[in-house]
Regions:
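Outer-membrane beta-barrel "beta-signal"
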Residues: 143, 206-216, 236-250
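Transmembrane beta-strands of outer-membrane beta-barrel pores
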Residues: 43-49, 79-83, 99, 122-126, ...
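Hydrophobic, lipid-facing positions within transmembrane beta-strands of outer-membrane proteins
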Residues: 59-65, 91-95, 116, 134-138, ...
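Short glycine/proline- and aromatic-enriched beta-strand/turn motifs that initiate or cap beta-hairpins
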Residues: 34-83
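Detector for outer-membrane/organellar transmembrane beta-barrel domains
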Residues: 131-192
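Solvent-exposed loop/turn segments connecting transmembrane beta-strands
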Residues: 50-59, 81-91, 124-133, 153-163, ...
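Cleavable N-terminal export/targeting peptides
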Residues: 1-38, 106-107, 250
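Repeated loop/turn-to-beta-strand initiation elements of outer-membrane beta-barrel proteins
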Residues: 37-39, 71-75, 102-108, 112-118, ...
Length: 250
């Protein structure tokens, strides 16, 4: 997210990066790309995280807010609720800092639309769940796409660290329609509790969306194309899924 003085494509790419980190609708916030504050309310047919389902079975509702600060700083919070019983599912918080690559020494010849991004992200699943974790991120931003890598020393609250690298892209088809895609790779670090290393995972997502005023409607398909989810997850959470959703920005 950028302040008004830096309203280039990097600002939109950074906002998209933060929105994805907070698990908002893929590359959403189309009507708020240059605001200092942006919020969304949305609903999705299913909650997915890095290519697999979560414990929040059924449709989920989400409320998110992002804010730009001075000198390229930004932050955001998001909450997720199950629609089947209205119960709390999870929450996220993100603080970050970003800027233009051409402002760095020796990189002045680069396009001002290219940028860098760094952030810290916290996932919270409620008291007593034991799955809360934090991760740090470094990213490269460009018009239409963002590449970033995340590192968590205690992935999902466990003793194992993990790296996750993702490429997110979006392409406008006309004034209303846009296509978006995602490719992610998860690598687990060594854990002496496991006799054999956990295999890497690769997930993908592809979808299409339409913007109607400040509403965004989207349909996507995601799943794993390599590796597998833990065996204690049921088949519905392990398999691919269609995601139908809507969000409104304000």
């Amino acid at each position: 997210m950028k302040t008004p003085a830096h309203g280039t494509a990097v600002g939109g790419a950074r906002r998209q990066a933060a929105a994805c980190a907070l698990a908002c609708a893929a590359l959403a916030l189309p009507s708020a790309a240059h605001a200092q504050f942006a919020g969304t309310l949305g609903i999705d047919s299913v909650d997915r995280y890095r290519g697999s389902g979560t414990a929040a079975a059924g449709p989920v509702a989400r409320a998110s807010a992002m804010v730009d600060g001075p000198l390229g700083t930004y932050g955001g919070v998001s909450g997720l609720w199950r629609t089947r019983d209205g119960g709390f599912a999870s929450a996220d918080a993100l603080v970050g800092w970003s800027g233009r690559l051409d402002a760095l020494p020796g990189l002045g010849a680069l396009s001002p639309d290219w940028g860098w991004d760094a952030a810290v992200h916290r996932n919270y699943y409620g008291p007593g769940e034991g799955h809360d974790f934090s991760e740090g991120m470094l990213g490269l931003l460009a018009p239409g796409w963002a590449l970033r890598s995340w590192f968590s020393p205690h992935y999902f609250g466990g003793d194992m660290h993990a790296f996750y690298t993702e490429l997110n892209a979006s392409q406008a088809l006309d004034d209303r329609w846009h296509a978006f895609g995602h490719l992610g790779w998860l690598h687990y670090g060594h854990n002496p509790s496991y006799e054999t290393p956990i295999a890497d995972r690769t997930d993908t997502l592809a979808g299409i969306g339409v913007t109607l005023s400040n509403w965004d409607l989207h349909l996507a398909r995601d799943g794993l194309v390599a590796g597998h989810v833990r065996g204690d997850h049921d088949s519905q959470r392990r398999g691919p899924a269609w995601i139908l959703g809507a969000s409104v920005a304000f």
